[in-house]
């Protein structure tokens, strides 16, 4: 299949339309000019014929009065003949040698007798093609003859040809200018499309940083804007894929590390038991360590499975109206020992009437995970569990006086196994950030929001907002 460049396609389409338009316009204009010239010639002859015929209204006419008409008409190369009622000419112009009876046909003479004017725009009955007008002469309503005016149309044809020639020159000039302008415009548009093609090639090769400058509001400009948006989205997708891949690798490394530590401990203890190198009085402690490390691995696996179920929305929430102070008391009782081990104080601040609309077990899980995170990074400090009523919502705050979180790490704290501080790598269960990942997913499933306010060295505050039911509102 023959390939034609887009530039030439544009030019060909423009030129084809122009040529077609010019052909139609020239044809119509030429026809109009010709018709107008003939019509004008016939009207002029008719006007003179009527004036000459009016000279006979009195019944008698001095032939000398016709000579001025002859002089005027001769300058226009027009001749006239006057016939009597028997179709015999009794006034002939000088040098007119045609047989008189051949000047008018019988049908034309009959029309004249009826008082009708005979007009013929182009007739070839004479040596030259002429326009012909015959006007009847009536005296007191009695037919007395006719006036015949004859004018060659060569002048009309010459004028029409001259107009057509000028039209041809104008069309050629316009066509040349149009082709030049069309070439420049086509080059301009093709250049813009070429930039789009080059940008597309770069995107195809993996360069998503490309940006097309665009200051036009036409379709190509809109396409360039859409291309920039597409490239931006592709770049974001690539960055997100790379980030997720990095997180996946880090996740695998973290899980492997966290599983390796208890497995190494368990393996060492089992080998010690098998080889009887562990004293009898230490075996109970050995079994206790094996049990703790096994539970630690089970918790890790359970947390991951739980997170995936929540993320894929495979769990169903059973929301109830629960007194907030009741939940706070359960969380405090559950984590009191862990807090005391780090010399922390757990304190509750909530009025008895404050209600939260949530899934009981999952809401406790949310508070336990956040509170455990606060205990983990607070030493000899205070941890507050606060609750209050907001506008159509319940507000829960968990605030500590711990080490805080760097500003640049706050948005990443919800990621699995993310460690915002190097101190998180060697702490007990809870350092993985897995609990906070679950928190965010669960809060969103409750149609709520959770945010973090933190300042390094001063502490961290988690703010949870859960909507109330219609009845409570």
Curated annotation (Swiss-Prot):
Q: Does the keyword Ion transport apply?
A: no
EC number assigned by the record: 2.7.13.3
Cross-referenced SMART domains:
HAMP, HATPase_c, HisKA
Q: What is this protein called?
A: Sensor histidine kinase YclK
- Disulphide-bonded residues: none
**Which residue ranges traverse the bilayer?**
10-30, 165-185
Residues covered by the HAMP domain: 187-239
Tell me the residue ranges located in the Cytoplasmic compartment per UniProt: 1-9, 186-473
**Domain Histidine kinase: where?**
254-470
Summary of the function given for this chain in its UniProt record: Could be member of the two-component regulatory system YclK/YclJ. Potentially phosphorylates YclJ.
**Residues on the Extracellular side?**
31-164
Task: Please provide one cellular component term from the Gene Ontology annotations of this protein.
Answer: plasma membrane
GO BP term (any one): osmosensory signaling via phosphorelay pathway
Report the residues modified as Phosphohistidine: 257
- Coiled-coil spans are none
Sample GO molecular function, one term: phosphorelay response regulator activity
The enzyme's first-digit EC class, named in words, is: transferase
Keyword Nucleotide-binding attached: yes
